[in-house]
Every structure is written in C-alpha cells, then in structure tokens.
Curated annotation (Swiss-Prot):
Its main location: cytoplasm. It is found in: Cytoplasm. Pfam families: HATPase_c_3 (PF13589), HSP90 (PF00183). InterPro entries: HATPase_C_sf, Heat_shock_protein_90_CS, HSP90_C, Hsp90_fam, Hsp90_N, Ribosomal_Su5_D2-typ_SF. It comes from Aliivibrio fischeri (strain ATCC 700601 / ES114). This is Chaperone protein HtpG. Molecular chaperone. Has ATPase activity. The gene is htpG. Keywords: ATP-binding, Chaperone, Cytoplasm, Nucleotide-binding, Stress response.
Length: 631
C-alpha cells in the first residue's frame, strides 16, 4: 500500500518490521547505547563496500577517497546525526533495506519470541537489529542518502516515526553517502553530549578501520563558542592488523559484536597471522549461543573476506565447511586477487589451502577448550553439537578429531546431559570389552528405559545413549574410534558371551535346546512377518524384543526417512524371546494353538511398541491382550 504525490510517497512497513520495532523499543531499552554501535557499524560497512566497488571504478570516489564516519548533535533541535561518505543508497535500496526485513528464517525468529524481555533481547541480538536500533532512543528518524556515482538530484529522503508507515521522496544531496538524523526521545537525550558519545565510541567502535569523528566546539575564556572542528575519537586501525599482545580481551569481544551483530560475548577466539606459502591473517570466533536459524539451510554463514585489508565480501562460505557454519570472523589474504569473485573462490588453490587451515584452527580451538575448560565446552556442545556431528560425513580428513569432540549421555549417569567424550568411554571400558556399545532412540527417556539395556546394566557394562535425530545417520559414518568398533545393542550380531562364565554358557546352551520347539512353533505361527525367531539371554525383566540384522537398516534410520517424506525399505525384524520370563513360560506351556497365537501376538506387539513406538495393526494386538486378560 502506498500513496504518492509527485516524487513523495507514503508506504506501509512490512508487518515483521512493525513487530521488530515494537520489540526493540520494549526489550532493549536497558541496553540502549547499542544503537550507536549498530549505526557506526553499518556506516563502516558502507565504506568497505565503496572501497571494494571503487577498485574497478575509481570515479565512485567523486574526488574524495578519505572515508569516515562523523557524529554531530544539536541540543536545541534535539537531534543526533550520524553521517558517512560510503556507498550510499538508491531509492530502490532504501525501500528494500529500510522498509522490509529480507532475511531467511524471519518467520521462525518471530515464532520463538516470548513475553520475557530478557530472553527476547537475546534473541533480537542474534537476529541482528542494525538500522532499526535507532528507534530505541529516537521517536523519529530521517535518512538522507545518495548512491555513489549517481547524480546529485538523485538523492533520497526517508522518514518514519516508527509506527506503521514511512515516507520516501527524492532530494538533491551534494555529497554521496548517508546521513541518519535521530530525533531523540526524552530517554535518549543523554547522547546529546560530547563526552557520552566519546565514551560509547571508545567502548564499541575503537576497532573500526576508518576514522569516527565528533564535531566539537570549545569555549573561549569568556565562555563563548569557538569555531568548531572534527575530532577523531577512535584508533581507526583495523583490529586484526594489530599485534595480539597489544589487544585487550574487551577489544576482541567488541570486535566480535561488530562482525556478528550479536549482543553476547563469544565463547573463545583465535587470532593468527601466517606468513609463508600463503600470507594471511585470520580472526575466528566461536559464539556462545546458536543463531535462531542455524538449522535452516538458507542460513547465511561464512567469514568476512578482506584482501590486503580491503573488504571484498560478507558471508564468504568457501573458507569454512558447512558443519562449522556457526563460526564468525574474518580472513585477510595477501594472495587472492582484489577482483576476486565467489565463482573464482570456488576452485581456487589458495581458497582450499585457507579453508583447510581455518578448519584445523577451529577444531584446535575446540580441542583446547574441551581439555582445559570442560564446563565451557559443554556450553558449546549444547548449542552447536548437532551441527558439529555433520562433520563426520562432510570432512573425512578430520573425522578422528571431530569424533573426539563428540559428547554423549551414557548409562553410567542417570542424566540426559551429553557430557562424556568417546575417549572417556574407552578409558572406562571393561578389560575384556573390545567394542563401544551404543543405543539409538527417539528420546533420552526411550533410550534409558530400553529393554535392550537389561543385561548391560546387570553386568555393569556402560552403553552410549544416542537420542538426537541425526544420530542413527551419524553412526553410518562413525564405525570406529581409537581402534574400537562400534556395536549397536539393538542389532542381531550382539555377542555378550565373553562377559559370561562357563556355568552361564552351559546353562544357556541347555535352555536353548529345551526351547527349540517353542521357537519353531512361534516361527511357524508368524511366517514371514518376521525374519527369524530365537531365544535371547540379554533380557531380565522383559519377555521379548525385536532386533535387526547387522546389515539391515535400523528402526531409527527408517523413521528418519519416513519423517522426511522418503520411502524407507520394510524392516524385517528378528523376534527374540526370553526363556526365563514367566510370560514366555506360560506361552510355551499353552497347548491350544489359538491361545498360543494370542500369546505370540501380545509378546510381539509389546516388542514392536518398545522398538517403534507404534503398531501396524494395533487392534490385533489389543484383541489378543484382552482375550488373554479375560481368561
């Protein structure tokens, strides 16, 4: 919807923008100074983009290549102005960037908002508020802008009071770039002060690679204003170009917020200058919290790319594998050409070398964190563990390293916390144990209560419990660790005989022989509904279970395919009965074939329910159970 008069029109905000403006004003007021960080960061990005475009078209500088950000305020008019002489915007750019949120996962973001202001403020921080943060301190915002290389009469003015609409009109603007004029609310007037502005710039924008200046007016001896001048406030040296020993942790943390637009401090970072075959500097951060849309395949990820300190592009995903898409930061290469494009990056030897080095650097950071600060690593794992698991299929060269970083729950602790690494499991293995036992299930509750665990608990053998959706797929790539094979305890090939003494083995052999006719009778009744029927001694309190062949698709994988809308091959189960269980003994003693069949239906139904959580024909199961109960 829009009304237009000559070159001026009033347009309605995209509905998500209205919602975001309302949320920011009410959720971020306690941290209102971040508006300045966001607006200066945007101005810095605009300068980076101009510098990049001017590589192929020097006329865009319009005779002025000295880039910078300038702040001035007018107490009488109650305004604060943030100006840059960067790339600027056309009318179409203004409508696209200031009237809509062109982000993947926007609907998902809004669906996760609550009425809890502290939680919402964290989520908004992850989403990245950018320009809209101006409305935290201003009740009206005017933007005057002109795109570099356009005529002076092609400037654009945008104005909004942060309600449902905004106006846009053509203006004449002498200089390229953007002026953002904030008409301050009462609670924003503290920023109409030179010292307050200097404090905030020093805190948030010292690392910006271009000058950030304030218009200052000194007083003479009589208290009258002298002629004003621009005073540079920040160091204006790109942080990653400085020596590590000269950079405080607080500076690294603020730079992270600049590149990520996150509100929280990162968990850790790595700053490295490498000289040799490839000359480059990398500054890589691991966030403390996962972005709301991390599992969305359209989620923008990748590093900022600079070549010889000149900004080239955002979200250069070629330098980081997909399973490390949560990593933020930048890479500054001396070896790539300044006119590099995404297409050139794709098949470039330098790119491949830098990608390999950055991947090893991140995995090294994680290994160091896991060894030195277990609590911090578990914080990382809770946020990013499921994504890291993807690396087992994606990055065969680093498979062993990634496997060492995995964390799982086990039967050793009555807790769903995924806290044990595979190296820790191997250390605790029984002397005669040569395999890593694991179980996959839909949930922690289903895993810890699985009947398949009964003998393991009785013999004190630890089992890894896997219940993330990705885990069954994961295990098709993770076949061994530290020379130890993985063994699913729901597969037919499970052999626990080495944990039995000779007396147990002899007893089992005798029982197996005694139950031979019961097994044959059960198989005869079931026909081809099951692959095989056999006795098992791995159960204690459960009468029967179903298992799959070692090379047949497991239950969890079949369910995963079905959930994704793909056809899963029919799983043929092996039906295992516990000859020591009272119900199985009753079944064995039943002479009447019809009644025997009801026992088989009930025990198989129970086993299928425990394994799959559902039955193909529940009425048959209920009928058999009801008839047995009615006897």
């Amino acid at each position: 919807m829009s009304e237009q008069t000559a070159n001026k029109e009033t347009r309605g905000f995209q509905s998500e923008v209205k919602q975001l403006l309302h949320l920011m004003i009410h959720s971020l007021y306690s941290n209102k100074e971040i508006f300045l960080r966001e607006l200066i960061s945007n101005a810095s990005d605009a300068s980076d983009k101009l510098r990049f475009k001017a590589l192929s078209n020097g006329d865009l500088y319009e005779g002025n290549a000295d880039l910078g950000v300038k702040l001035s305020f007018n107490e009488a008019a109650n305004t604060l102005t943030i100006s840059d002489n960067g790339i600027g915007m056309s009318r179409e750019d203004v409508i696209e960037h200031l009237g809509t949120i062109a982000k993947s996962g926007t609907a998902d973001f809004f669906s996760k908002l609550s009425e809890d202001q502290s939680k919402d403020s964290q989520l908004i921080g992850q989403f990245g508020v950018g320009f809209y943060s101006a409305f935290i301190v201003a009740d009206a915002v005017t933007v005057r802008t002109r795109a570099a290389g356009s005529e002076k009469d092609q400037g654009v003015q945008w104005h909004s009071e942060g309600e449902g609409d905004y106006t846009i009109e053509d203006i004449t603007k002498e200089s390229r770039g953007t002026d953002i004029i904030l008409h301050m609310r009462e609670e924003g007037k503290e920023f109409l002060n030179e010292w307050r502005l200097k404090e905030v710039i020093g805190k948030y924008s010292d690392h910006i690679g271009i000058p950030v200046s304030i218009w200052t007016v000194e007083k003479d001896e009589e208290g009258k204003d002298k002629e004003g001048k621009w005073e540079q406030v920040n160091k204006a040296q790109a942080l990653w170009t400085r020596s590590k020993s000269d950079i405080e942790d607080a500076e690294y943390q603020e730079f992270y917020k600049h590149v990520s637009h996150d509100f929280a401090d990162p968990l850790t970072w790595s700053h490295n200058k490498v000289e040799g075959k490839n000359d480059y500097t990398s500054l890589l951060y691991i966030p403390a919290k996962a972005p709301f849309d991390m599992m969305n395949r359209d989620h923008k990820s990748g590093l900022k790319l600079y070549v010889q300190r000149v900004f080239i592009m955002d979200d250069a995903e070629q330098f980081m594998p997909t399973y490390l898409r949560f990593v933020k930061g930048l890479i500054d290469s001396n070896d790539l050409p300044l006119n590099v494009s995404r297409e050139i990056l794709q098949d470039n030897k330098v790119t491949q070398s830098l990608r390999s080095a950055c991947t090893k650097r991140v995995l090294g950071m994680l290994e160091k964190m896991a060894k030195k600060d277990d609590e911090k690593y578990l914080t990382f794992w809770k946020q990013f563990g499921q994504v890291l698991k993807e690396g087992l299929a994606e990055d065969l060269a680093n498979k062993e390293k990634i496997a060492g970083l995995l964390r799982f729950a086990t039967t050793e602790k009555d807790s769903s916390e995924q806290a044990l690494g595979l190296a820790g499991y191997v250390e605790r293995m029984k002397e005669e144990q040569d395999k890593i036992f694991y179980l996959t299930a839909d949930s922690y509750a289903a895993a810890k209560n699985s009947p398949h665990l009964e003998q393991f608990k009785a013999k004190g053998i630890e089992v890894v419990l896997m219940y993330d959706r990705i885990d069954e797929w994961l295990m098709s790539y993770l076949t061994e660790f530290d020379g130890k094979q993985f063994q699913s305890i729901t597969k037919a090939g499970l052999d626990l005989s080495k944990f039995e003494d000779e007396a147990e083995k002899e007893k089992h052999k005798e029982t197996e022989e005694e139950f031979k006719s019961v097994v044959e009778r059960t198989k005869s009744y079931l026909g081809d509904r099951v692959k095989e029927v056999r006795t098992t001694f791995k159960l204690a309190t459960t009468p029967a279970v179903v298992v799959t062949d070692d090379f047949e698709m497991g239950t969890q994988m079949a369910k995963l395919l079905e959930a994704a809308g793909q056809a899963a091959p029919e799983v043929k189960y092996i039906f295992e009965i516990n000859p020591d269980h009272a119900l199985v003994k009753q079944m064995a003693d039943e002479a009447d074939e019809e009644a025997f069949g009801r026992w088989v239906e009930m025990l198989l139904g129970q086993a299928m329910l425990a394994e799959r959580g559902s039955l193909e024909d529940p009425s048959q199961f209920l009928s058999a159970m009801n008839q047995l109960l009615a006897k």
